[in-house]
Structures are given as structure tokens and as C-alpha cells.
Amino acid sequence: MELPVLRGERVTLRPVEEADLDPLSGVIQEPSVAQWWGEAEEPERLRHNLRMDGDAFAIEADGELAGWLGFVEETEPEYRSVSFDISLSERFQGGGLGPDALRTLVRWFADERGHHRFTIDPSMLNDRAIKAYAAVGFKPVGVMRKAELHDGEWADALLMDLLIDELR
């Protein structure tokens, strides 16, 4: 799918480009990001994870690359939903850019692609992310036990979902 450029209140979402891979690889190596993503990603692995075929947006703030927002879209009529992953550079965290990016993309998927349900699954240990997603309207719906490796130990992840009429 060819992705559009989307504008939120404070962010611009645009398709990830080849030139973004090295800077985004650097973002994933920052301590506050790496603790949730595991080992540092080389550009080739990052390219695969960002699904360079069109399933990720670069997040820009004030003209600077701030991070990325990936998605998996379920298009089967019986199961329509979109799942998200997001990562912001340390210097862009805590200012509301993540929630703005998520709101912007949720609205686009609802308005342009007909989706009504969205999910995200942060580590249960990532309080900052859980609060940010709750600010958008995501609600906890379950715990995925021992879902991800964190500091060499299996940790639970919190499954959160959002119905379009709950978007804040």
C-alpha cells in the first residue's frame, strides 16, 4: 500500500525512506528505547522490521526525524483491526508526540480504511508507554504472559485496545 503524508497537531507522519534507516537504527540503540526493543538493530534487520513495503511511518517533529510508527493491518472483513508499534527518540519523549502520532494514524485508518478497532501491546514494565496509550483512549483488555524477553527474563505484555468512538 502506498502511504500518504499525514499531519497531526505536532507531528508529520510520512512513509519511511531508505535514508531513515541509519538514524532510526540509532534511535533503537538509545537506552530508553533499547530497553524495550532488545538488542540493537542493524539497518538490514531494521529494514525488515519497519516493513519497507509500506507498513511504517516516519514520525517528524519540527522537521526532524523523531521516530517511527509501524502497523499491521488486518483487512479480512470479519476481523478488521490495526495493531501498532511505536518508537520515539529520547529527546522527543514526554512531550505528547507519541499520542499525537497515534491519534493521527488512528483517524486516518478509521476515515480512509474503515477500521473501528486498534491494538497495542506494551511491556507491563513500561509505565510511560501505558500512560501515553491510555491518554489516546487505549484500554487494557488482557495480559499476554511471558510475551517478551526483557533483561534476559520473560516479561508480560499488556494488550490494550481502542474502539474508534473512544479516541481522545
Feature-to-residue mapping (PLM):
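A short, well-structured alpha-helix characteristic of acyl/acetyltransferase catalytic modules
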Residues: 1-51, 166-168
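Conserved GNAT acetyl-CoA-binding A-motif
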Residues: 112-121
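Conserved beta-strand-loop-alpha-helix junction that forms the acyl-donor binding cleft
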Residues: 120-130, 147-151
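Glycine-rich acetyl-CoA-binding "A-motif" of GNAT/NAT acetyltransferases
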Residues: 64-67, 128, 154
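Conserved acetyl-CoA-binding loop-helix of GNAT-fold acetyltransferases
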Residues: 94-108, 127-135
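Conserved active-site tyrosine of GNAT-family acetyltransferases
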Residues: 133, 138, 160
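Acetyl-CoA-dependent GNAT
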Residues: 35-93, 108, 163-167
